[in-house]
Amino acid sequence: MVGIKVREVYKYENVELSNGVKVSAYEVTVQDGEVVTVSNGNVVVNDKQFSFSIYNYGINGEKTYNLNNVPADIDGQEIVKEFVVFVETDIA
C-alpha cells in the first residue's frame, strides 16, 4: 500500500513575528509538514499593512508568492517566508 498524502488546513490570527510584525492567515494548507498554499493572508507592520497568498505549483513544489499593496519600505516576501517557517515549525 502506498502512503496517502494528508492535507490539513489551519487558521492563524495575529501571529507575532520578529520586529512586531503581525500576520493573520485564514486558510493555511499543509501537506506532509510543508505549507503548500495560503489564502487570505494579512500582514501588519508599523501601522502599515498588505495582503498575500501563496500557491504551490509544479512538480518541484515551487512556491508563488502573491503580495498586494506592500509598502515600499517593507520586504514583504521575507516576512511571508518567515511566516511559512513559523507555521511549519508550529505543526511539526
Regions found by a protein language model. Give the residues of each.
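Negatively charged, low-complexity tracts enriched in Asp/Glu with abundant Ser/Thr
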Residues: 1-37
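Surface-exposed charge patches in extracellular/virion surface proteins
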Residues: 5-7, 48, 77, 81
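A short, structured beta-strand/loop element
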Residues: 33-63
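Mixed-charge, Lys/Arg-enriched low-complexity segments
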Residues: 53-92
